[in-house]
């Protein structure tokens, strides 16, 4: 995968300029308004409203696209004008794109691999993994994905629509673009796949054919355009392609002799082969020459060159001015050659002195390989053995590292650890000395589980017994110590503090084989708010600081567990019912006659005082539950006084339901001390609320 950056087009300096087209109908520079419209369209493409701008190869629609445009932006860049005006800032439209076509990358890898292995016959190395193989160390020529793509396809070209807006349809990667300054400025290869591992490019042959179909003359004709763009934007030299030649080539430039490092001795034979044949004798012999002899020798050499058949004029035909100029040049060359000869003799003398003195050891120390052998770190085993030497003995070493001694098993313990029992006892004895001193009793309580509001009643059963025995209504109960603080629930039931004792019920005895009794279905409240009773305003809840929230599982935990077998208790005898569950007794009502009931009778009698109603022992007069019988009004008779009717006669005249004749049951507001049932609990709830 390639990440490329390049200039797509220059922006006109005039902000109000219009689109300027050339003779072929192409715009060389775009106005600022058009660039802004290109940016807005590209933002819509990035957001997914439109398709992204594709990247093609040389405007070939029959080949698959190379990638898509990631971003378009307007920046200011320094531009070197080719007309000699110098460097100045200009606005350009810059593109950032991603090339993800595996076929194109594979074709680029194959062509680079063929060029570096077959054509150049040189060693190479690829630090970014663009080419597989090569040298592992940085030796030879460096071949990267950046150099491969910028040496072959450094140009960019816009493919626009022929409409009024000239909207961008695609951007192509090509040999050279037609607009000025449209080249790649940067490229990076980030996929370390290599040539051998890249097997996904099935259309790489099509790209290779497209590259081979281009005539050489067409590619070389674009060389001048690429050179101008490179000089204009100041791109690195690795973008120079197609064998660009130096225009200011000097004919007198000759290759210099190969330079050798100072540390190594100079080979005299190599130096002789690099110098002219006439100067070989001067180096081999130690005879000193005077400047006059050198000047005469150079003059003779130049005369021989002038008299060669390649010259158009003979020495006699040369004028005086030309001869004087040649003599000046010869003198300058003679001075340079004399200084060069002195330097060569100096280097040879130093090399001979170093060879005689035997200073090769110094050069060996300068070698990085020998320095690595001298300062190499000891192996792993040597480092471990060196740690043992720091202590007095091996036992002292083990005492300072008790963790290694715990889990180390010696050969003598093999027979002892053979049986499972001995192995278990041995492992337990190994940690006895650390178990007692690791935690105190108070520290161990910190690691016990704490109940949370999210835990059900089942999970609370697995907690330590001392937490279950803790009373909920104690004054020193710290809620934050055992429960998480949360916001008040939506559904709350208000319970007064003086009624909390009656509301709390002890858990029912559990028996495994007892029949299931009907379970009281309590309304689903999130929690209960316990508030102090106020005499004047009972309907107003106190402040939040005076409230005390009690969870449902604290008040009645037995009714939140639907899988517990309950035992039915007879409330009168207090004995356990073995097999038949006792149904809840019907509610009883006590009827109290406040005034004697008068009825119309045929027989006229004298009125009598009403007989008092005899209350059975244990009955309670409840004024709230008085039943007043609605009877017809009594008609006045000519008899002066009416005859009262007894309660028995009234009952005979209008019988009551059989529930009224059933025996009543005594109710008490005291906290029950014995076993109760769900029916008894319902009765207590009716009395309280």
From Swiss-Prot:
Q: Where is the composition biased (Basic and acidic residues)?
A: 362-388, 409-418
Please give the function described in this protein's UniProt entry.
Answer: May act as an apoptosis inhibitor.
Q: According to the entry, what is the taxonomic lineage of the organism?
A: Viruses, Duplodnaviria, Heunggongvirae, Peploviricota, Herviviricetes
Task: Determine the domain of life of the protein's source.
Answer: Viruses
Q: Where is the sequence biased in composition, kind Acidic residues? A: 613-624
Coiled coil (UniProt feature): 320-351
Write the protein's name. Uncharacterized protein ORF107
- Does the UniProt entry include the keyword Coiled coil? yes
């Amino acid at each position: 995968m390639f990440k490329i950056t390049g200039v797509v087009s220059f922006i006109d300096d005039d902000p109000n300029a219009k689109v300027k087209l050339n003779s072929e109908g192409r715009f060389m520079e775009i106005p600022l308004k058009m660039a802004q419209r290109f940016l807005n369209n590209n933002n819509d493409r990035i957001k997914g409203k439109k398709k992204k701008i594709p990247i093609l190869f040389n405007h070939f629609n029959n080949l698959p696209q190379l990638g898509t445009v990631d971003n378009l932006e307007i920046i200011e860049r320094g531009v070197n004008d080719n007309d000699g005006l110098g460097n100045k800032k200009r606005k350009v439209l810059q593109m950032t794109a991603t090339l993800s076509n595996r076929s194109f990358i594979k074709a680029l890898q194959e062509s680079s691999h063929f060029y570096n292995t077959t054509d150049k016959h040189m060693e190479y190395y690829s630090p970014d993994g663009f080419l597989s193989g090569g040298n592992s160390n940085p030796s030879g020529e460096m071949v990267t994905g950046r150099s491969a793509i910028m040496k072959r396809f450094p140009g960019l070209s816009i493919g626009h629509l022929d409409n009024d807006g000239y909207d961008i349809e695609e951007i192509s990667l090509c040999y050279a673009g037609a607009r000025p300054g449209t080249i790649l400025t940067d490229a990076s290869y980030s996929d370390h796949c290599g040539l051998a591992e890249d097997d996904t490019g099935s259309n790489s042959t099509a790209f290779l054919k497209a590259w081979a179909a281009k005539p050489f003359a067409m590619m070389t004709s674009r060389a001048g355009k690429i050179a101008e763009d490179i000089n204009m934007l100041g791109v690195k030299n690795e973008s120079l392609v197609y064998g660009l030649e130096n225009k200011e080539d000097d004919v007198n430039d000759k290759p210099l002799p190969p330079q050798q490092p100072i540390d190594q001795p100079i080979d005299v034979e190599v130096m002789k082969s690099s110098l002219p044949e006439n100067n070989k004798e001067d180096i081999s012999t130690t005879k000193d020459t005077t400047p006059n002899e050198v000047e005469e020798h150079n003059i003779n050499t130049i005369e021989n060159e002038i008299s060669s058949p390649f010259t158009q004029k003979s020495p006699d035909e040369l004028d005086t001015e030309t001869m004087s100029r040649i003599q000046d040049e010869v003198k300058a060359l003679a001075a340079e050659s004399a200084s060069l000869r002195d330097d060569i003799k100096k280097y040879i003398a130093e090399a001979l002195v170093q060879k005689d003195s035997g200073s090769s050891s110094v050069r060996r120390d300068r070698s990085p390989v020998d320095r690595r052998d001298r300062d190499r770190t000891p192996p792993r085993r040597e480092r471990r053995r060196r740690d043992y030497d720091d202590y007095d003995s091996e036992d002292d070493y083990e005492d300072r590292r008790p963790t290694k001694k715990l889990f180390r098993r010696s050969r003598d313990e093999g027979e002892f650890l053979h049986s499972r029992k001995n192995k278990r006892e041995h492992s337990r004895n190994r940690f006895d000395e650390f178990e007692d001193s690791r935690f105190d009793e108070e520290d161990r309580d910190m690691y016990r589980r704490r109940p949370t509001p999210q835990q059900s009643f089942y999970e609370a059963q697995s907690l330590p017994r001392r937490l279950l025995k803790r009373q909920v209504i104690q004054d020193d109960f710290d809620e934050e110590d055992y429960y998480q603080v949360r916001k008040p629930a939506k559904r709350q039931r208000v319970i007064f503090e003086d009624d909390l004792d009656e509301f709390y019920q002890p858990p029912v005895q559990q028996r495994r084989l007892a029949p299931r009794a009907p379970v009281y279905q309590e309304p689903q409240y999130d929690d209960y708010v316990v508030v102090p009773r106020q005499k004047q305003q009972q309907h107003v809840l106190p402040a939040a600081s005076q409230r005390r929230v009690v969870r449902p599982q604290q008040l009645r935990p037995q009714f939140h567990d639907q899988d517990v077998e309950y035992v039915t208790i007879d409330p009168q005898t207090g004995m356990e019912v073995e097999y038949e569950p006792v149904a809840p007794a019907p509610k009883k009502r006590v009827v109290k006659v406040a005034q004697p009931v008068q009825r119309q009778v045929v027989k006229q009698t004298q009125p009598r005082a009403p007989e008092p109603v005899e209350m059975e022992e244990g009955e309670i007069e409840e004024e709230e539950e008085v039943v007043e019988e609605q009877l017809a009004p009594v008609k006045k008779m000519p008899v002066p006084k009416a005859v009262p009717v007894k309660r028995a006669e009234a009952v005979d005249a209008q019988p009551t339901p059989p529930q009224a004749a059933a025996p009543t049951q005594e109710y008490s507001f005291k906290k029950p001390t014995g076993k109760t049932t769900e029916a008894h609990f319902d009765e207590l709830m009716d009395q309280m609320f």
